[in-house]
From Swiss-Prot:
<dbReference type="InterPro" id="IPR050084">
    <property type="entry name" value="NADPH_dep_7-cyano-7-deazaG_red"/>
</dbReference>
<comment type="pathway">
    <text>tRNA modification; tRNA-queuosine biosynthesis.</text>
</comment>
<protein>
    <recommendedName>
        <fullName>NADPH-dependent 7-cyano-7-deazaguanine reductase</fullName>
        <ecNumber>1.7.1.13</ecNumber>
    </recommendedName>
</protein>
<dbReference type="GO" id="GO:0033739">
    <property type="term" value="F:preQ1 synthase activity"/>
</dbReference>
<dbReference type="GO" id="GO:0008616">
    <property type="term" value="P:queuosine biosynthetic process"/>
</dbReference>
<feature type="binding site">
    <location>
        <begin position="95"/>
        <end position="96"/>
    </location>
    <ligand>
        <name>substrate</name>
    </ligand>
</feature>
<comment type="similarity">
    <text>Belongs to the GTP cyclohydrolase I family. QueF type 1 subfamily.</text>
</comment>
<dbReference type="Pfam" id="PF14489">
    <property type="entry name" value="QueF"/>
</dbReference>
<dbReference type="InterPro" id="IPR043133">
    <property type="entry name" value="GTP-CH-I_C/QueF"/>
</dbReference>
<dbReference type="InterPro" id="IPR029500">
    <property type="entry name" value="QueF"/>
</dbReference>
<keyword id="KW-0963">Cytoplasm</keyword>
<dbReference type="GO" id="GO:0006400">
    <property type="term" value="P:tRNA modification"/>
</dbReference>
<keyword id="KW-0521">NADP</keyword>
<feature type="active site" description="Thioimide intermediate">
    <location>
        <position position="54"/>
    </location>
</feature>
<comment type="function">
    <text>Catalyzes the NADPH-dependent reduction of 7-cyano-7-deazaguanine (preQ0) to 7-aminomethyl-7-deazaguanine (preQ1).</text>
</comment>
<dbReference type="InterPro" id="IPR016856">
    <property type="entry name" value="QueF_type1"/>
</dbReference>
<feature type="active site" description="Proton donor">
    <location>
        <position position="61"/>
    </location>
</feature>
């Protein structure tokens, strides 16, 4: 196949040399148009190599970040998501902040119907922290889904 397929013109990172940022960089996130907007479906990202810094001690924190969402018009491009998550490597934030920041940045990028983000952080001092946050588009059935998922998440 030659040329750029329809919808891929929106993306700038695929096929180009990867430059890793050393600072928190939400601007690296890219979105493309969902070709199946008439369907409800789940997209899941498992990100097992997430790293951030404790804002107090400067020690590294490690986690698997899980992102589930139901797209609307836009979807996040996976390489840009990888670079975005990598940008937390030298960013100081508590575990709870990390998952909320990630969710809010993805909402700003895509305006999904529904999204949830949770982090399974490696134990520190014998305690693991597993923060969860979610969002459903206001005034829609996805808002009700968010409420139900929050009530049943464990």
């Amino acid at each position: 196949m030659t040329g750029i397929r329809e919808g891929e013109k929106e993306l700038s990172l695929l096929g180009s040399k990867t430059e890793y940022r050393n600072d928190y960089a939400p601007e690296v996130l890219e979105a493309f148009t969902n070709k199946h907007q008439e369907n409800d479906y789940w997209v899941r990202f498992n990100c097992p190599e997430f790293t951030s810094l404790c804002p107090i001690t400067g020690q590294p924190d490690f986690a698997t970040i899980y992102i589930n969402y139901i797209p609307d018009v836009k979807m996040v491009e996976s390489k840009s998501l990888k670079l975005y998550l990598f940008s937390f490597r030298n960013h100081g934030a508590f575990h709870e902040d990390c998952v909320n920041i990630i969710m809010k940045d993805l909402i700003a990028l895509m305006q999904p119907r529904y999204i949830e983000v949770w982090g399974d952080f490696t134990p520190r001092g014998g305690i693991s922290i597993v923060p969860f946050c979610n969002y459903g588009k206001p005034g829609s059935r996805y808002e009700l889904l968010a409420e139900k998922r929050m009530e049943t998440h464990h």
